[in-house]
Amino acid sequence: MDSMTEKQRYFSQPVERITGMDDTPERSLFRLTESGVYFREHRISAGHPGDPVEIVQITDVHFNYCDDIDLQNPELAYTKECRKWLADGASVGGIKNAMGFAKFADQIVITGDTLDYLSHGAMEMTKTYIWDVEPTAILAIGGHELTRQMQTGRPNETTLESRYADLQREWKHDVSYVSRVIRERVMVIAMDNDCGRYRPEQFEKLTADLAEARSKGYVVLLFQHEPIDTGRPEDACCPTLWECDGASYNFRHCIGSPERNDSETAKAVYRLITSSADVIRGIYCGHLHSAYYTEVIAGDTVIPQYVLEGNPYNGQVGHVMRILVE
């Protein structure tokens, strides 16, 4: 009788290294040769006894779909006419494959732009292919969830506040901030930072969660859509590990950079993050669609910051980040 579990069988398939070498695991990208899923790994040594806590990140799914309810809205009908990338739900294959990898983890986190734009059809896809598969999945939001206009050249016809409210009615957890403790060892925090913004209530919640993590010895993993400034001059032209939308990116013009006119709240959240390297062991983002590895200067140490490539690429095989806290 085959004594292998479903998880053991899944991860026994051959692995191909796409980029990187053994001595640079943070810059390595792999592919499972049978399922086709591309994956990266971040292993964190936390000195905890027992099996590793496993978190899987997916990002930038971009469900682009209008159903009959949406087509009664002239704004969405025009977006359907203009927006052709991944039209008619073409990204379903990619998320099904990525979720096939992620279902074995203790926690799934998706870091924004799950929706390509705010529509009933895209929300129904999110429920069917993500929350119905794993009801505990955490979905941080990006900018795409908050617009009904995509490549139309027109402004939204409703206020941002009303679109936040519409999204929140459909979301399974708070769209702004959510934290969860996994097996009393790892605290997962997901924050909305679309368009480079943070809000006062996020600062308050993050402050309280970091204090709890320190007192209880939790490893904190921070998930958000957009990356933050690394503080490293050389990262003004940081090369990608895997090119999709661009060969390099300026990580000195992200949230927290002195070059930006960020709000006082955004600056305060950035300072809080970069003064908390004792508990924050990784920052995980999307937004850029290509793969990057950076390190955020945090006092006399650094916090690893991984930017995961977008999920729909390479023929809808799926792209994931596997984080193991050991």
Regions found by a protein language model. Name each.
Residues 6-123:
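N-terminal active-site segment of His-dependent metallophosphoesterases
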Residues 64-68, 147-150, 230-234:
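Short acidic/His/Gly/Ser-rich catalytic and metal-binding motifs that mark active-site loops
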Residues 96-108, 187, 196-297:
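His/acidic metal-ligating clusters that form di-metal
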Residues 51, 103, 135, 278, ...:
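Structured loop/turn residues at beta-strand edges in well-structured enzyme cores
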Residues 14, 20, 25-47, 120-219, ...:
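Extended active-site neighborhood of metal-dependent phosphoesterases/phosphodiesterases
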Residues 59-63, 112-114, 143-145, 193-194, ...:
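Active-site metal-binding loops of divalent metal-dependent hydrolases
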Residues 71-86, 156-165, 238-260:
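Charged, glycine/proline-rich intrinsically disordered loops and linkers
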Residues 84-85, 112-117, 192-197, 255-259:
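The substrate-binding groove and active-site-proximal loops of carbohydrate-active enzymes
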